[in-house]
């Protein structure tokens, strides 16, 4: 059994405006042993960056990353391989 937990960070504080910049996840087995963990950092589809939001990565680093379509298949495969998915702050 595989359990996927993930969190999405955005540059604006909203997850529905194309500002997603990080998809961080942890994949664990049924005993909660970590199989894999990773931060997928991507350039958002917006130029807005809220100054009140403290991001884990520098703005220049985020802007230099590929956009979401480059990671879509990786994220889709990850989700398809999990038996349970737990998302934090996904709305």
Give short role names for the model-derived ranges:
Residues 2-4, 8-91:
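Conserved non-catalytic scaffold segment of RNase H-like nuclease domains
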């Amino acid at each position: 059994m595989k359990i996927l937990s993930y969190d999405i960070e955005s540059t604006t504080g909203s997850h529905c405006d194309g500002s997603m910049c990080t998809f961080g996840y942890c994949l664990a087995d049924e005993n909660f042993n970590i199989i894999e963990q990773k931060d997928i950092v991507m350039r958002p589809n917006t130029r807005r960056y809220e100054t009140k939001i403290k991001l884990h990565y520098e703005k220049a680093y985020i802007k230099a990353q590929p956009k979401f379509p480059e990671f879509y298949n990786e994220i889709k495969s990850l989700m398809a391989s999990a038996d349970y998915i737990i998302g934090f702050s996904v709305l």
